[in-house]
Amino acid sequence: MNRTEAREWVVKMLYQYDVSKLPLEKIFENFYEEHDPGEQKEYIEGTVRGTVEHLEEIDREIEKYSKDWPLYRMPRIDLAILRCSMYEMLYGNIPVSISINEAVEIAKKYSTDDSPSFINGLLGAFVREKGLEEGEANDN
């Protein structure tokens, strides 16, 4: 499994957590029954756990940049994509441009026709206001 596939699974797990409220351990268990994450296991679990741990802060940031589009009206998959990308940019060591590009690609694959541009615009505004450089990784 490569990092792009792992990121897709992070989004799927965050989506499942959001809609089912299953404990994270059960979500991981279900995933490992059918998939071998290989060397991506640490990234997957760390990103899912970290996103859930910082969910309130991440959701506040998403609401701030969503321009009159409350979280409860967003497609749940878009919310999972945004949460994953914001977590990576705030707490991960992933270059900003990669995180945004992958978020847009996941949206193209799993969400509505309007979602990629919405996600790109929201994440772009977040990066500009936070002063994050397009290509740099966060030092947190």
Swiss-Prot record:
- Top-level taxon of origin: Bacteria
Q: Which gene name does the record give?
A: nusB
- Keywords, comma-separated and alphabetical: RNA-binding, Transcription, Transcription antitermination, Transcription regulation
Keyword match Endoplasmic reticulum? no
Q: Name one GO cellular component term.
A: cytosol
- Xref: InterPro entries: NusB-like_sf, NusB_fam, NusB_RsmB_TIM44
What task does this protein carry out?
A: Involved in transcription antitermination. Required for transcription of ribosomal RNA (rRNA) genes. Binds specifically to the boxA antiterminator sequence of the ribosomal RNA (rrn) operons.
> Entry's CDD domains?
Terminator_NusB
Give disulfide pairs as residue numbers: none
Which molecular function term from Gene Ontology is one that the record holds? RNA binding
Stated family: Belongs to the NusB family.
Name recorded for this polypeptide: Transcription antitermination protein NusB
The GO biological-process annotations, alphabetized, read as: DNA-templated transcription termination; transcription antitermination
Among HAMAP family, the record links this protein to: NusB
